[in-house]
Every structure is written in C-alpha cells, then in structure tokens.
C-alpha cells in the first residue's frame, strides 16, 4: 500500500494516467418502485418501502466517491438508506432484488451497509468499539479541506450535508463547526468508495457528512468492476447524486473556509460587506 504520507488518487493533481472521472449517474436498471428523473441523478421510491435498489451507471474508479444526498423522507417506515458495492453487472440481473439486504447480498459478490441514526463507524483493528463510536470532530473541515482515506485524498467541502439556515438556526448550532446533520436526516450526504490494497483486494469505505466510517467491508475483488449500490429503503424516499471535483479547492471554497473561521454564527454573514452571491454560497443556500 502507498505510504500514508503520500496521498494520491482522484484527489491528487490531475494527470493523463489518472483523469477526472465522468459525472456519476444512476443505472437504467433499478427496483420496480423507483422513478428516475431524466438526468439519471435523482431516484425516488414512489410506493411501498421496498423495491428501491439502484446502481451506479458505470463501475467506480478506485477512490471515486458515489455520493448521494437524502432529498425526501417518508414517515411510517422502520429503516433507512442502505449503501454498498457489487461486482455484479446490473444489466446481467434477471430481476432486481426486492431488498439489498439480504436479497442482493445473498446473490454473492455484493457488500451492503445499512445506515442507522447512530453506530455507523467501524472500529479499527485493536480499537474499542465505544471509542470508535465517538465522532472525530466536524471542525476538521475548517482546518483541513481534504478527507484522507488510506491512499486517497478527497475534497471534503461537498461531502458534508447541512440544514438550510433558518431564523433561529444560529441558536441550535455553533455555525458550521457543529452543524453536521444526523446520518439519516434530510439533506444528509452519504457516499461509498473502495480503496485497493497490495494483495489485490480492496476495502469498502462509507462516508457520512464528510467523515470516514472506516472499512465496512474487506477483501473485495479490486480487479473486478465494482458498481455502487443505493437502496432507497423505508423512511428514505428520495436521493439525488452530488458531483465532486477532485482537483484543488476553488478560490470560492477557500474564501468560504476563511469566512467561516471569523464569524460567530450564520446570521453574522448577512452583515458582511460581500456580494449577495458570495453570502449565499457561504450559507450553503
């Protein structure tokens, strides 16, 4: 494996050997209750709580994040979004399974993680489970614009889901340092990627609002095409894809990071002598 101090991959400088990946899209093969928008970037379950399995249109590149944002929730169901990878070509399936867990996984060559409101973090080897459950601290976004997972470096800014600023929202969070949504909340952002290892296998990682949950599956066949799996299950009704840029952070993004360090709460941005467009960008509107 690459030296941890030498983070490479899609988050590193672009080169002919590692070009920017194409925009992510959902596959035209999906569960019976899924309605896909014309662009292939939004998937909505139109009835029931099942038959909501979706796939990426193309296999993922190593270190490429398939990132979704929860757009709609539906009350009355128990359970949440499920996320993972499969080495099965969606086009080769005789029928899309009703559930990703256990149906798709039981077909083999598929690894799926059920997202819960708590306890999504996977303990590292030798790490107590209680210690793994403690979040690493969302303020890292303000000092480190990249998320580092094994040998890959991924721009963190678009990985983080945030609630829309409200009239009293500044009383409920300490600006963006603590304004990280619960994993299953509306506007929360969740992603999946794989990281190859020297032995020819790969680790699957789940990202929730800019934080790596650790290797939720090991021993994946890195040499085989791996498609993302998104199960729009139960209380999760609709998701949309979020596109990432893997180069250097834009000047606009760096400006936002600096501004966030110097204001007390979100409403304070309104009194700054800045163009309205930049204010809206800083407030994630």
Swiss-Prot record:
GO terms for biological process: intracellular signal transduction; myofibril assembly; protein ubiquitination; sarcomere organization. Pathway: Protein modification; protein ubiquitination. It is found in: Cytoplasm. SUPFAM superfamilies: SOCS box-like. GO terms for cellular component: muscle tendon junction; VCB complex. The keyword Flavoprotein does not apply. Keywords: Cytoplasm, Ubl conjugation pathway. Residues 23-244 form the NHR domain. Residues 1-28 are annotated as: Disordered. Pfam families: Neuralized (PF07177), SOCS_box (PF07525). Expressed specifically in skeletal and cardiac muscles. Residues 250-285 form the SOCS box domain. Probable component the ECS(NEURL2) E3 ubiquitin-protein ligase complex consisting of ELOB/Elongin B, ELOC/Elongin C, CUL5, RBX1 and NEURL2. Interacts with CTNNB1. Plays an important role in the process of myofiber differentiation and maturation. Probable substrate-recognition component of a SCF-like ECS (Elongin BC-CUL2/5-SOCS-box protein) E3 ubiquitin-protein ligase complex, which mediates the ubiquitination of proteins. Probably contributes to catalysis through recognition and positioning of the substrate and the ubiquitin-conjugating enzyme. During myogenesis, controls the ubiquitination and degradation of the specific pool of CTNNB1/beta-catenin located at the sarcolemma. The SOCS domain mediates the interaction with ELOB and ELOC, while the NHR domain may be involved in ubiquitination substrate binding. This is Neuralized-like protein 2. The lineage of its organism: Eukaryota, Metazoa, Chordata, Craniata, Vertebrata.
């Amino acid at each position: 494996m690459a030296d941890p101090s030498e983070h490479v991959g899609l988050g590193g400088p672009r080169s002919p050997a590692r070009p920017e990946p194409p925009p992510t899209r959902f596959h035209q093969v999906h569960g019976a209750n899924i309605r896909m928008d014309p662009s292939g970037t939004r998937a909505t379950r139109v009835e029931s709580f099942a038959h909501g399995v979706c796939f990426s249109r193309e296999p993922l590149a190593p270190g490429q994040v398939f990132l979704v944002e929860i757009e709609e929730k539906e009350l009355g169901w128990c359970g949440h979004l499920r996320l993972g990878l499969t080495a099965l070509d969606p086009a080769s399936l005789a029928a899309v399974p009703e559930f990703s867990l256990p149906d798709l996984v039981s077909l083999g060559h598929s690894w799926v993680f059920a997202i819960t409101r708590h306890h999504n973090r996977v303990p590292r080897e030798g790490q107590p489970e209680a210690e793994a459950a403690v979040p690493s601290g969302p303020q890292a976004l303000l000092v480190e614009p990249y998320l580092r997972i094994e040998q890959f470096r991924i721009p963190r800014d678009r990985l983080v889901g945030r609630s829309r600023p409200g009239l009293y929202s500044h009383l409920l969070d300490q600006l963006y340092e603590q304004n990280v949504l619960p994993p299953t909340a509306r506007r929360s952002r969740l992603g999946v990627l794989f990281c190859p290892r020297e032995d020819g296998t790969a680790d699957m990682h789940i990202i929730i609002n800019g934080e790596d949950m650790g290797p939720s599956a090991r021993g994946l066949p890195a040499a085989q095409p791996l498609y993302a799996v998104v199960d729009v299950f139960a209380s999760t009704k609709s998701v949309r894809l979020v596109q990432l840029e893997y180069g250097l952070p834009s000047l606009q993004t760096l400006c936002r990071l600096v501004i966030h360090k110097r204001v007390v709460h979100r409403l304070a941005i309104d009194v700054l002598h800045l163009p309205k467009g930049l204010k809206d960008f800083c407030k994630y509107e």
